[in-house]
Amino acid sequence: MEMSFRWYGEDDPVTLENIGQIPTMKGIVTAIYDVPVGEVWSRERIQQLKEKVEAAGLKISVIESVPVHEDIKLGRPTRDLLIDNYIQTVKNLAAEGIDTICYNFMPVFDWTRTDLAYQYPDGSTALIFDETVSKKMDPVNGELSLPGWDASYSKEEMKAIMDAYAEIDEEKLWENLTYFIKRIIPEAEAVGVKMAIHPDDPPYSIFGLPRIITGLEAIERFVKLYDSKSNGITLCVGSYASDPQNDVLEISRRAFELERVNFVHARNIKLGDGKSFKESAHPSEYGSIDMYEVIKLCHEFGFEGAIRPDHGRMIWGETGRPGYGLYDRALGATYLSGLYEAVIKGSK
């Protein structure tokens, strides 16, 4: 299991030097953020990114992510050229020794929260999703702004794309994902790249948009789209646990049994009323996920890939990108590494 940390590039207030000082830290999870979605990432740009990370004594563990263009998700005629570009990016990453790519197939929005700075009684702030608030939000009127999004839309563009998705139900989205997978995975497999689809976050429909990577049944359907370990998943326990109907430990065990876990996101959440939840500190006592059991499964199945603490609270007066501060994620990383050491030594 390789401990890793998300880095948003030169604009990230958390520096590579900061990350390198975290005990047990080995890898960086990052991307090239200024290439428009759908265009090829050149080898030169990948080399520059790789050199910068390695100069800090770290390595690129995972690319998160190479975004999937909306035209691919919508199944538009332009998708073939866009998929060709995606394949070339995969090949360029492989040529530079990068072998794991996290991506998602969520329509329009990446991870979605209703408050980016909910304040806990101790003064720390965290990301939360309030189901009641979400039902009152209108994305067309620009009431959403998230640091994790790869694109921003004008009001007119947002209306147009939301209208386009009105014609796409879950089965049609599955059909479009299948088309993408059958084009991408053979090429990824040929160059030794493991693709890792991230679950929808949260894993249920929002704003009337279809969501399909949502739980155990979805994972079992997904891996059958193309039988290859290159066609794998990102086991984001916080995302899957956000639906109270999901048993995240059952999902985790089954995903490992299928040998399709190519990347792990380990964060905790505290379930609330209905489908509401708050992101919490990583230790089990603060959330609804038994993190010890998650790490135990990683060891039981011999997981050797990258794991990252994913989101964290903002603590100790830190400001910056919500969910992606240094301090709480660093605490999370060392906590997860401590669990891993305890599991290993306890199994002897």
UniProtKB/Swiss-Prot annotation:
E.C. no: 4.2.1.8
Pathway recorded for this protein: Carbohydrate metabolism; pentose and glucuronate interconversion
Cofactor or coenzyme needed: Fe(2+); Mn(2+)
Transmembrane stretches, start-end: none
UniProtKB keywords: Iron, Lyase, Manganese
Taxonomy, superkingdom: Bacteria
Reactions the enzyme catalyzes: D-mannonate = 2-dehydro-3-deoxy-D-gluconate + H2O
Function: Catalyzes the dehydration of D-mannonate.
Protein name, UniProt field: Mannonate dehydratase
